[in-house]
Amino acid sequence: MKKINIIAILLFLSTAVNCFASGAYYLPDVTGEMSAASYWTKESEVLMSYEEIEKLNEEIISAKGTNMYDLKNQPEVIDGIALNEAIKKSSQADAGYYLGWTYFESAEKATQEDFDKLIENTQNPDAKKEQKVLYGIATKRTELRTFPSPVAIWDDPADSDLDYQYLVGVRVNEPVVITSKSKDGKYYLAKNICCSGWIPADAVAICSDKEEWISVWDIKHDDALVVWGDKVFLESSVVGKETSDLMLTMGTVLELAKDVNPDELVDNRAAYNNFVVWVPVRNDDGTYSKKKALISEHKKVHKGYMMLTKENISKVAFSALGNTYGWGGGLYSDDCSGYMRNVYKCFDMELARNTTWQSSMPMAKVDMQYMAKEEKIKFFDALPFGTILYFNGHEMMYLGAENGKYYVISAVGTIMQPENPTVRQRIRSTIINTLDVKRANGNTWFDEITLALVPYFGINENALPEYDWYHGGVAYCLKNKIMQGDENKFFNPTKNITWAEVLQMLYNMEEVKPEYALEDDAPWYARAVRWAEENMLICENDKGFNPNSQITREQLASLFYLYAKFKGYDVSVGEETNILSYDDAFDISEYAIPAMQYIIGAGIIKGKTISTVNPKDSTTRAEIAVIIERFIGCKSN
């Protein structure tokens, strides 16, 4: 009996994860072979030139909603007094957000007094009415923080790896514009290209002026060494203690030293089989200097920015596979949006900080929030590798489809357990999974995807697959809860629609819906039919009316004509419409002629072809969705 139980348990577990001889574990439908970057793509076509990427960066920085900073053009003098006041107000707002559900490195919830101490430290005691900004360079992997304090802010005392202080990771040699300092002098208020927050002062070197600052990080392509691996460490050295074991994370860009004599010792070593780079150093007085360091040619680094190809995107993304997830850049790692930023930084592309801000970037994108399921499937089948997919609070890189499954790679905090989707499972790693994984609301990731964005195509390029003519109408009707999919969330666009369904849609469009007392066994459409009958929306000439019968195009025209008059809309628009221009005009029933004139004249229904209206044909769900959207547009105009 015990043996049977053990076997049953093993069989149960095998449905939850895959385990291979290597000892690595995978989520369902993920195999060991899929962990290789080359499994997904080997395409080496250059997707964008360096010049195109530079132009795109300018557009991203200037686009409304991306919250990016043009660092070179920030004000050089600010009002420090006013800034102190603004910082205090914003910090009070932040404290109000966190108060009541967070902890300060203890089992006791943080109090208002705890936050007041942090807020007090935001005030620069040396603030001036006219205050020059400072120009800093990060000398070690660090972060921007919510408050100027090392104290961690947790939402769970048992989960000290997730610290809400972290806003974004800052790479070695990354520039920041400094606008203020904390009361204790241990933090600077700073901006990097995508965020603002408090940076530890001991992680920043202050340049002598703006010109020196720009020269440190504005590196020409041929003079740059780019770290494309998740983490690269400089070698240990007693002689070179300033750079010994220095961590360089994905997307770090350093300047290559020129005119190097390989016999010249760098930290007690010759330069053979190494790159020689300049590394920023913070002097004892906090000022900037630089020193040479060696990086092995076998490290995951690249001379110049990498060429933007699908093969290289995959290579970079997979260098972080299995590594730690770090909220806001914590744990010297990154979260989902930070991970995507780091990947594309290796190609000199600057993405916005978070999922919301990235959605405003001027790139090829498609809003899938209200896309019907079958259309979504068709759309996914044509998605290019490297597309960034979004739903509320998460983003991921699309890899491809296999055996009807869609695969993504992302830095993941939690998912619902595949074998028990009511239980939340902490992941905290960069992983591969299918879009069959579920969220806490019971929907799959596939169901929840709201946006697809291709970073390597401009906004005017046809980078994403085209979607069907009825997408706008379907999206409108789903969004406004006029229509819905079936129990499996399929929209069924080609299915013919019935009288009952159309009447229910019109009923759904009413802002104030009359309630009727109905029998327990009344059909689902009973209220809508009764409402339509009371308001004389069913034409008396439709003697064959049956709620479950399919509605013809001329019946639909008559229904919308009567509904427009019921709502008080102007129906005179169709009085001059010459429907005799259609070859099958005499097939239109006499009672429906005014309605067909109105609905065709208003552009709500169009001919099946240039010369026919097919009045006796049935109407599909896709057609009615578009008709409703056009009808609402007519009403608005």
Name the predicted role of every residue range.
Residues A8-N18:
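Bacterial N-terminal signal peptides
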Residues S22-R145, V151-D156, D161, R171, ...:
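Boundary regions of SH3-family modules and the immediately adjacent low-complexity/disordered segments
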Residues S22-S38, C194, D202-V226, D230-L234, ...:
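Aromatic- and glycine-rich peptidoglycan recognition patches
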Residues G169, L351-E419:
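...with weaker cross-activation on analogous glycine-rich loops/strands in unrelated enzymes
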Residues N173, D222, T249-L254, F385-G386:
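Loop/turn positions that initiate beta-strands
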Residues K231, S236-A293, N323-D334, Y390-K438:
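Glycine-rich catalytic cores of cysteine/serine-nucleophile enzymes that process amide/ester linkages
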Residues A317, W327-Q358, W499, L503, ...:
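Active-site nucleophilic cysteine motif
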Residues N460-H471, K479-E554, L562-A592, K606-S618, ...:
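Feature responds to low-complexity, polar/acidic, surface-exposed segments characteristic
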